[in-house]
């Protein structure tokens, strides 16, 4: 399988603190790849490095065959790499549909002058945007609430809306940071089904979370991070039975249980 994302020797230091140290992994086309670890393990820092929010202290990141190390988020989004954040990033006073339109900016915005004047190209771009909004809302089961204010949605649906905004740019790779944090088990199951539908549309995913049950039932491969370093890497079954993972999550006394 073709490697879509390649991370080699990734590191980030904050003063004397090594938040991420020598992470190396790859994500193939069409894969749901997981990164898990206890709170404070360095998962979100790794995502920030890959998505361009934070510059790495060392290492290399390649996406779709090109070196993208240190490139800013808007450049990566245009190349097909987008992400969500732990907290919901929706405009609460805008409708679900209006929120989705925001996500089309990078891929469909015609430029300042075409947008200012009513050109044929600008009209075509706006029409394409509306078509895409309707498609994404239908796809993620948000069409029935499209005209409601985002603030009126349950928290789980707001998380799905954040995913919809990121999908408006039709990324090749979508990174989801803590997609089920704060959700009930039923809401988490719904998010898992939504992620699978996204993958079925040909979009690869990197999912970052500390919910072991959720991740084991979703991802093909999982990287376990602890203190900013790789602790284990493999299939869900391999990492769930790894002694170092058991010790990190449950304590040393459970390793031989």
Predicted regions and their residues:
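Glycine-rich phosphate-binding loops of nucleotide-dependent enzymes
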Residues: 2-257
């Amino acid at each position: 399988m073709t490697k879509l994302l390649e991370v080699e020797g990734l590191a980030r230091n904050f003063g004397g603190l090594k938040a991420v140290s020598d992470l190396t992994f790859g994500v193939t086309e069409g894969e749901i790849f997981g990164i898990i670890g206890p709170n404070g393990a360095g998962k979100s820092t790794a995502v920030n490095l890959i998505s361009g929010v934070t510059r790495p202290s060392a290492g290399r990141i390649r996406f779709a065959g090109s070196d993208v190390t240190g490139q800013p988020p808007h450049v990566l989004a245009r190349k097909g790499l987008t992400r969500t954040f732990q907290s919901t990033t929706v405009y609460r006073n805008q409708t679900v549909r209006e929120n989705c339109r925001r996500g089309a900016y990078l891929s469909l915005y015609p430029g300042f002058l075409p947008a200012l004047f009513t050109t044929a190209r600008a009209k075509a771009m706006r029409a394409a945007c509306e078509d895409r909004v309707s498609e994404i809302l239908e796809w993620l089961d948000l069409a029935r609430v499209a005209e409601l204010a985002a603030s009126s949605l349950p928290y789980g649906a707001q998380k799905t809306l954040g995913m919809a905004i990121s999908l408006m740019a039709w990324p090749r790779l979508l990174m989801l940071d803590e997609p089920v944090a704060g959700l009930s088990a039923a809401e988490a199951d719904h998010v898992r089904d939504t992620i699978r539908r996204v993958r079925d549309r040909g979009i690869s995913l990197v999912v970052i979370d500390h919910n072991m049950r959720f991740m084991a039932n979703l991802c093909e491969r999982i990287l376990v991070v602890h203190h900013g370093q790789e602790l284990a890497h493999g299939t869900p079954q391999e990492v769930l039975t790894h002694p170092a993972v058991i010790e990190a999550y449950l304590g040393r006394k459970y390793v031989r249980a």
